[in-house]
């Protein structure tokens, strides 16, 4: 299947959207992974929650999600701020041309430090990491910080995922660290690891871009940049299936 990763500057969203549509028209991918809460500027750079800013971001994401059919795709994955039963969540969605929007995961591991005051802005969700199946494709979601908790990658791999998807918003100074994590998570899961990231600036935070596609043995197949903000590659789902039978994935780690 052909998969697209992206880095997006939320302050230039209208322009970025048109460029993304052009790329998709040229490459005809089967799926697109968007960055974490990408349809509004990164508001978590502010340490104090502002209810008006939060609600505006929720509304903005709702409007942009309604525009996903413009891309002409069958499958899009991303995250959005969401009000749910009196709580605020960073929720992952799966959009398909056939069924529209499905909410498939909510972020549970929340950073709370300079530029990333997420625990101040929204609620921690219960721990719930379940693969999602779309036809013959199986995906697992880890939203940004969640990828560091490798037990979930291992569990997803045992449950047969092909793609480990990591929408994120991370700073430029940490790009090398995050890529190392993505490569490791791919190996642990025995799956392709895809990540899309914010670019540009949010207040004093320089956002890193550098979305990636890593194969199940951790090789970096693609890395986005300012000059190449969108990349589409063929990923062989059979390679992810075969990886489950090779080292280190086959090792028995059940308690004895």
Positions of predicted regions on the chain:
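Short, acidic/polar
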Residues: 14-23, 147-154
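Cys-nucleophile CN-hydrolase/nitrilase-fold catalytic domain and related Cys-dependent amidase chemistry
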Residues: 21-98, 172-191
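CN hydrolase (nitrilase-like) catalytic-core segments centered on the catalytic cysteine
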Residues: 57-74, 148-229
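Short beta-strand scaffold segments in enzyme catalytic cores
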Residues: 77-79, 90-94, 130-132, 211-213, ...
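Active-site catalytic loop in hydrolytic enzyme cores
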Residues: 83-159, 174-180, 242-249
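Extreme N-terminal starter segment of soluble prokaryotic enzymes
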Residues: 1-5
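Structural motif
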Residues: 31, 137-139, 163
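Short polar catalytic/cofactor-binding loops
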Residues: 7-13
């Amino acid at each position: 299947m052909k998969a697209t990763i992206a880095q997006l500057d939320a302050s230039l969203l209208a322009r970025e959207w048109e460029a993304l549509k052009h790329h998709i028209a040229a490459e005809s991918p089967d799926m697109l992974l968007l960055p974490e809460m990408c349809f509004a500027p990164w508001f978590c750079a502010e340490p104090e929650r502002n209810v008006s800013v939060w609600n505006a971001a929720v509304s903005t994401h709702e409007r942009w999600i309604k525009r996903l059919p413009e891309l002409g795709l069958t499958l899009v994955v991303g995250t959005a701020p969401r009000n749910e039963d009196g709580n605020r969540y960073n929720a992952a969605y799966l959009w398909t041309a056939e069924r529209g929007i499905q909410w498939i995961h909510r972020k549970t591991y929340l950073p709370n430090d300079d530029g990333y005051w997420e625990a101040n802005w929204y609620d921690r969700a219960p721990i719930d990491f379940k693969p999602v199946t779309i036809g013959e494709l199986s995906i697992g979601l880890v939203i940004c910080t969640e990828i560091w908790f490798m037990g979930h990658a291992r569990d997803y791999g045992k449950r047969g995922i092909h793609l480990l998807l990591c929408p994120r918003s991370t700073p430029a100074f940490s790009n090398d660290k995050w890529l190392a994590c993505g490569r490791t998570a791919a190996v642990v899961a025995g799956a392709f690891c895809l990540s899309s990231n914010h670019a540009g600036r949010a207040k004093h935070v320089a956002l890193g871009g550098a979305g990636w596609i890593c194969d199940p043995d951790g090789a970096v197949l693609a890395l986005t940049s300012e000059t190449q903000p969108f990349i589409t590659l063929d990923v062989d789902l059979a390679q992810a299936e075969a990886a489950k039978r090779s080292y280190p994935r086959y090792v028995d780690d059940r308690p004895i």
